[in-house]
Amino acid sequence: MTFTTCGGGAFLHIPKTGGTWVYYLLRENGMVASPFGHEHGHLHNEEWAFCVLRHPFGWYASHAAFQRASGFSTWTGAEHPLAEIVHHQHPTIDGMVRAILEESPTFLSRMYGKFLDSSKYVLRNETLVDDIMSLSDKVGWSIRLRSFREGRRNETPHGELSDETKRMIEECDPDAFVQYVNAPNV
């Protein structure tokens, strides 16, 4: 779902952050120019680019829930951003997150870093509607939310992580939290 936009930009789709919703919203509004490269590519030649980040707790919970719901799919190729962690399987969300952190403790900050290095604007999953409207104002798009105001696309319901798992995420990958807080906002 990585694509160029009308107005000389590019959307860089970080998995499990709300990118499918962004794609469908912009497509419905005629802002998608053309897909490019890999579905989740982070390199581009456009004037500017944007991506969406998700709070690290939410990102890990969403990824683990999606993997469980898909039957632990290993659908990624070697170039996919999740290739390093997609093989993890565990019957609980907490167990899967802990297994990922034990093998790849800084995975999320490394993945976020690749996309942040190429992005001028950063939206947050938790404030996505407001952020996409702010971006629209900055880059001169005319976006109508229509049915998109309520709900998401491709959203996997997930539970809360345990306090123990949250502490483990904070200890293993503090840079992911720094990136989430300090990335340039819209």
Regions found by a protein language model. Give the residues of each.
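Membrane-interface amphipathic segments in extracytoplasmic regions
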Residues: M1-V186
